[in-house]
């Protein structure tokens, strides 16, 4: 699938291709790629794309411009009056699309209405960029709508009639006033473009004492979100100018442009297996087998890290079998000679792993099948960035569009929405009096720099109005607790263990940053549309003002997830998070049961202090229960670290070859 440049929800006017066609307006999800402008139905309840309703080939577009607004439009297409933009809490769906623009192509104008002027500008700019080399660009356009069989601006009755107004700025590569030429060749660059291309590159910074400047390759495309960002093109190389422990690095591209990039979008060129479709970094043997069987294709294969042999790789291959209807799977360790050559079959040596894979894609050479079809856990979608652009932590509420309410949490209502009409976000609307706001705002910048693939990313805050908003990554499948209770299927033990592993990876990261969660539980973990579990609300319990929540004697205090030292002395540490993780594992394996379900909070406190521990859930093996139980040692110092717990969880997975 082509890379998506822009994605937004707009109001689309019907094109009335037939004289009898009705004039109507419908909300559609628009996607822009290098080759097509497409629009789809949109499921506002689930936040998902529906069926495709139409598309326009980019090469057929002749003009993109604004349209003069209608006279006396209905409320949904009226520009909000001053002050209305800030009444955000009352909006649960996109209600207004007052900013029209037109995309003109061989079948006439396509009229689109944007919810904000800024979003309209962005789309017009990007559309003009992708059509700039089109051969049929026009230099006159119709500034007003086509209605009732004619253009309101000039009364011409032919839909494809020449425009009546000269474009103020040149359209694409042509200049205003220049005769129209039908040629498929791109026009030569203008003097301004020539100057830009020929501008000499700035000198490379001097190498550091440690050696040469770091070079990286982009794993994903990245479209800049602000002026300080640098665009990334998947597969392109970049030079790192400033590297830090923070999630944004300053980089330079091959054309000399400089800016900030998300560090989790690139990898060192010397370690670039991640750019290959066949490589899955964090996947276990049992997960690989499950995926290969689901795909069921002869020669399906996965290259993955070996969990039992650090630094080694394993190739898992599927082949059909007359004996077993589910097929058979073999796992081959990628071996390395003393001369650093790789092989699966000793007679065939290669200098790199990609060369080895390429060879076996054409030759089985001792394998049960040649490597025909790369299989992955999911399409490698781009990860979340730490903030919506470099240095952007204060978000303008006018850039937010509210789509639906997700629920109510400790701090107030949570809604699903879009940032600048394009990026899915969750918006926590903080109820006044529920949070120590000033203290949280001071800490928000620090929390934004916590970035890990198994943490729900904090994008930013809106603090210049009340209520304040916390903007985070959107997780389509909601909280883990409800996911466990409501999913209408039986979870396999490997799936439950993977959920625990996801959480443990996030907690190991927080542990390494000396950051405490303080309220780890299934209700505070979320599940995305790919079934990956991420830890949410880390550290937020410090800012709760409700005594019923902050006091260990309060009715809302998480007694059932708390160790004795917290219940007795309110003593929090990484080891109190470890205790909570053990209870979370119990929740997962009991499919969302309430811990200590037969006792109230005060009884639970008494029993925990006296040494009572949760029983082994039916779905948990003895080895899994041993990990849970190790988290509940009375002495905090005797509990394992999250790093040790992660190692134990990995060890439980099927033995590696």
UniProtKB/Swiss-Prot annotation:
Zinc fingers, Btk-type class: 134-170
Question: Which residues are involved in binding Zn(2+)?
Answer: 142, 153-154, 164
PANTHER family hit by this protein? TYROSINE-PROTEIN KINASE (PTHR24418)
Please give the PROSITE patterns that the UniProt record associates with this protein.
PH_DOMAIN, PROTEIN_KINASE_ATP, PROTEIN_KINASE_DOM, PROTEIN_KINASE_TYR, SH2, SH3, ZF_BTK
Give the protein's recorded name: Tyrosine-protein kinase BTK
Can you summarize the PTM annotation of this record? Following B-cell receptor (BCR) engagement, translocates to the plasma membrane where it gets phosphorylated at Tyr-549 by LYN and SYK. Phosphorylation at Tyr-549 is followed by autophosphorylation of Tyr-220 which may create a docking site for a SH2 containing protein. Phosphorylation at Ser-179 by PRKCB, leads in translocation of BTK back to the cytoplasmic fraction.
Record domain SH3: where: 211-271
- Phosphoserine PTM sites in chain numbering: 21, 55, 179, 306, 321, 602
Query: What does the record say about its membrane topology?
Result: Peripheral membrane protein
Q: Which reaction does it catalyse?
A: L-tyrosyl-[protein] + ATP = O-phospho-L-tyrosyl-[protein] + ADP + H(+)
Residue span, SH2 domain: 276-366
Organism of provenance:
Gallus gallus
> Any idea which residues are catalytic in this one?
519
One of the GO biological process terms? intracellular signal transduction
Per the Swiss-Prot or TrEMBL annotation, the motif CAV1-binding is positioned at 579-586
User: Where, per the database record, does this protein carry Phosphotyrosine?
Assistant: 40, 220, 342, 359, 373, 549
Annotated 1D-myo-inositol 1,3,4,5-tetrakisphosphate binding lies at: 26, 28, 39, 53
Which cofactor does the UniProt annotation name? Zn(2+)
| Activity regulation, short description | Activated by phosphorylation.
Q: What is known of its domains?
A: The PH domain mediates the binding to inositol polyphosphate and phosphoinositides, leading to its targeting to the plasma membrane. It is extended in the BTK kinase family by a region designated the TH (Tec homology) domain, which consists of about 80 residues preceding the SH3 domain.
InterPro entries in the record: BTK_SH3, Kinase-like_dom_sf, Non-receptor_tyrosine_kinases, PH-like_dom_sf, PH_domain, Prot_kinase_dom, Protein_kinase_ATP_BS, Ser-Thr/Tyr_kinase_cat_dom
Task: Please give the residue ranges the record annotates as the region Inositol-(1,3,4,5)-tetrakisphosphate 1-binding.
Answer: 12-24
GO MF terms listed in the record are: ATP binding; lipid binding; non-membrane spanning protein tyrosine kinase activity; protein tyrosine kinase activity; zinc ion binding
Record-linked SMART domains? BTK (SM00107), PH (SM00233), SH2 (SM00252), SH3 (SM00326), TyrKc (SM00219)
Q: Which residues carry this modification: N-acetylalanine?
A: 2
Similarity comment text for this entry: Belongs to the protein kinase superfamily. Tyr protein kinase family. TEC subfamily.
- Where is the Protein kinase domain positioned along the sequence? 400-653
């Amino acid at each position: 699938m082509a890379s998506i440049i822009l994605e937004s929800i707009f109001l689309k006017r019907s094109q009335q291709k037939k004289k009898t066609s009705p004039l109507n307006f419908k909300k559609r999800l628009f996607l822009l790629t290098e080759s097509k402008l497409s629009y789809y139905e949109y499921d506002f309840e689930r936040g998902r794309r529906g069926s495709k309703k139409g598309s326009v080939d980019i090469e057929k577009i002749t003009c993109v411009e604004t349209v003069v607004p209608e006279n006396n439009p209905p409320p949904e297409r009226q520009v909000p009056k001053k002050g209305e933009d800030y009444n955000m809490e009352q909006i649960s769906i996109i209600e207004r699309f007052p900013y029209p623009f037109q995309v003109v192509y061989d079948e006439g104008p396509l009229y689109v209405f944007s919810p904000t002027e800024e979003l309209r500008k962005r789309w017009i700019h990007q559309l003009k960029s992708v059509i700039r080399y089109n051969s049929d660009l026009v230099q006159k356009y119709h500034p007003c709508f086509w209605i009732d069989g004619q253009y309101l601006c000039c009364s011409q009755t032919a839909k494809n009639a020449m425009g009546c107004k000269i474009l103020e700025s040149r359209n694409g590569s042509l200049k205003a006033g220049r005769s129209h030429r039908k040629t498929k060749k791109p026009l030569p660059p203008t003097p301004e473009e020539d100057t830009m291309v020929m501008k000499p590159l700035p000198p490379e910074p001097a190498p550091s004492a440690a050696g040469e400047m770091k070079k990286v390759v982009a794993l994903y495309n990245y479209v800049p979100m602000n002026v300080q960002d640098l665009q990334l093109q998947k597969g392109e190389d970049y030079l790192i100018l400033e590297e830090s422990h923070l999630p944004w690095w300053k980089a330079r591209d091959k054309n000399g442009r400089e800016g900030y990039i998300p560090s989790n979008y690139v990898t060192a060129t010397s370690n670039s297996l991640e750019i290959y479709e066949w490589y899955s970094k964090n996947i276990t043997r049992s997960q690989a087998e499950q995926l290969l069987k689901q795909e069921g294709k002869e020669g399906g294969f996965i290259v993955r890290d070996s969990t039992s042999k650090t630094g080694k790789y394993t190739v898992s291959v599927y082949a059909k079998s007359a004996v077993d209807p589910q097929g058979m799977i073999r796992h081959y360790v990628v071996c390395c000679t003393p001369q650093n050559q790789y092989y699966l079959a000793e007679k065939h040596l290669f200098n790199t792993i990609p060369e080895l894979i390429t060879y076996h894609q054409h030759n089985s050479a001792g394998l049960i099948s040649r490597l025909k079809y790369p299989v992955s856990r999911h399409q490698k979608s781009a990860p979340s960035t730490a903030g919506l652009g470099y240095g952007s932590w204060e978000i303008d509420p006018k850039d937010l569009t509210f789509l639906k309410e997700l629920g109510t949490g400790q701090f107030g209502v949570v809604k699903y929405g879009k940032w600048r009409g394009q990026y899915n976000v969750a918006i926590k609307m903080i109820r006044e009096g529920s949070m120590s706001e000033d203290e949280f705002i001071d800490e928000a910048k620090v929390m934004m720099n916590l970035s890990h693939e198994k943490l729900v990313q904090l994008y930013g805050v809106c603090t210049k109005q009340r209520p304040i908003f916390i903007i985070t990554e959107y997780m389509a499948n909601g909280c883990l607790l409800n996911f466990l209770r409501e999913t209408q299927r039986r979870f396999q033990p490997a799936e439950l263990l993977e959920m625990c592993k996801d959480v443990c990876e996030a907690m190991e990261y927080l542990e390494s940053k000396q950051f405490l969660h303080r309220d780890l539980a299934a209700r505070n973990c979320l599940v995305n549309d790919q079934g990956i579990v991420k830890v949410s609300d880390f550290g937020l319990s410090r800012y709760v003002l409700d005594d019923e929540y902050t006091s260990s004697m309060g009715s809302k205090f998480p007694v059932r997830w708390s160790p004795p030292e917290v219940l007795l002395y309110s003593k929090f540490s990484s080891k109190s998070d470890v205790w909570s993780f053990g209870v979370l594992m119990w929740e997962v394996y009991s499919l969302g049961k309430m811990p200590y379900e037969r006792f109230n909070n005060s009884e639970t406190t008494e029993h925990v202090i006296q040494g009572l521990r949760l029983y082994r859930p039916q779905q948990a093996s003895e080895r899994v229960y041993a990990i849970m139980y190790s988290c509940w040692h009375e002495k905090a110092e005797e509990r394992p670290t999250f790093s040790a717990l992660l190692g134990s969880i990995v060890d439980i997975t099927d033995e590696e070859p």
